[in-house]
Curated annotation (Swiss-Prot):
GO cellular component, one term: cytoplasm
Record's protein name: Elongation factor P
GO terms, molecular function: translation elongation factor activity
Main location: cytoplasm
Origin: domain of life: Bacteria
SMART domains the record matches: EFP, Elong-fact-P_C
Naturally occurring in which organism (per UniProt): Jannaschia sp. (strain CCS1)
Annotated GO biological process: peptide biosynthetic process
Keywords: Cytoplasm, Elongation factor, Protein biosynthesis
Record family assignment: Belongs to the elongation factor P family.
Length: 187
């Protein structure tokens, strides 16, 4: 595994630090008036989700880990476990539903997601950035209410509540960004 300097850490990098695997969530490069420059890095443990703030000087060496990414197709859920099938080998694997966190409701039957592995252990899963959902409940459209840039609450077919523009009505399909959990556009 390659070692990188502390000032080369970027958001999204996976590092081996303090005996665990950590994902760099946020990186701030700081150059104080006195003393050497350093990177203030917010890390998230890939195994248990705990967070840690660390300071890395430019001279510090950190082990960067490359994760293997595989496409997995969602099949079904059983006892809090999500069952996926590898798109290439047709091998089935079970992953805990907590791996997706608050994005879990956006997982749909047959959807292909990217799962990141390290030594055959699934550490992270990412949904497609945009997903089509149906609005099942929202306030009716009121004419003339488009003057201000306002939004109204809507409940989607998966139970998630998002804010939508006033022109979106009930039973309409919309596109939702799964990373921010916000309305993107009409489908």
């Amino acid at each position: 595994m390659p070692k990188i300097n502390g000032n080369e850490i970027r958001p999204g990098n996976v590092l081996e630090h303090n005996g665990g695997l950590w994902a760099a969530v946020k990186v701030d490069h700081v150059k104080p008036g006195k003393g050497g420059a350093f990177a203030q890095v917010e890390l998230r443990n890939l195994r248990n989700g705990s967070k840690l703030n660390e300071r890395f000087r430019s001279a510090d060496k950190v082990e960067r880990v490359r994760l293997e990414q595989k496409d997995q197709q969602f099949l079904y859920e059983s006892d809090g476990m999500l069952v996926f099938m590898d798109a290439e080998t047709y091998e089935q694997i079970e992953l805990p539903a907590e791996l997706l966190g608050e994005r879990r409701p956006f997982l749909q039957d047959g959807m292909t997601i990217v799962v990141e592995f390290h030594d055959d252990e699934a550490l992270n899963a990412s949904l497609p950035q945009k997903v089509v959902c149906k609005v099942v409940e929202t306030e009716p459209v009121v004419k003339g209410q488009t003057a201000a840039n306002s939004f109204k609450p809507a409940i989607l077919d998966n139970g998630v509540k998002v804010m939508v523009p006033p022109f979106v009505g009930q039973d309409e399909d919309i596109v939702v960004n799964t990373e921010t959990m916000d309305y993107s556009e009409r489908a």
